[in-house]
Amino acid sequence: RIHPCPVNKCKCSRAPGRSLSYSKRIINEIRQNPSKCQIFFYQTSPPPSLAPYPLQRLRPYPSSMNPRDLEMVVVTNFQSQSKRRVLFNKFQISQLEKRLKQRYLTAQERQELAHTIGLTPTQVKIWFQNHAYKMKRLFHDDHVEASVHKWPIKSAHLQPKVSTRVV
């Protein structure tokens, strides 16, 4: 896997995770002043004696690489960076929580909800997945705490429903 790395605190050090337009500006800087930056690549399988963490061991990129290949390396790397975390506003969260009461959202319902609250359907899907995992973890943590301390579970929504029918 190829990775840009700073040399003497070059601006390349701030490139990963930035937008593609930012990476294009970096490419222009590299073209104009190639001595300011040096491209490195990961050696993915060095001998164990050379590095305790193989992916952290860097080697200079071969000097035989032409500038067009260099551009492809840089652009490809920037495009593969993960997107920034999306912070939902209160309105979006309230709308998502309202729909949470339904067990399952169809793709169409998810798309409509996403459009209504200004998110992508994928963001809505991931929010529901994350919320389900959070509830599962809270349920598990409450049960572990209750069994360790022999205290009753305080969360009413996690308690099993008991029938209170009077005959």
From Swiss-Prot:
User: Which Gene Ontology biological process is one annotated for this entry?
Assistant: cell differentiation
DNA-binding region listed in the record: 80-139
Name of a matching Pfam family: Homeodomain
Quote the InterPro entries the UniProt record gives: HD (IPR001356), HD_metazoa (IPR020479), Homeobox_CS (IPR017970), Homeobox_NK-like (IPR050394), Homeodomain-like_sf (IPR009057), HTH_motif (IPR000047)
Q: Where in the cell is it found?
A: Nucleus
Arranged from A to Z, the UniProt key words for this protein are: Developmental protein, DNA-binding, Homeobox, Nucleus
User: What start-end ranges are recorded for coiled-coil regions in this protein?
Assistant: none
Alphabetized CDD domains for the sequence = homeodomain
**Family per similarity comment:** Belongs to the NK-2 homeobox family.
Query: What name does UniProt use for this protein?
Result: Homeobox protein EgHBX3
Q: Its encoding gene is what?
A: HBX3
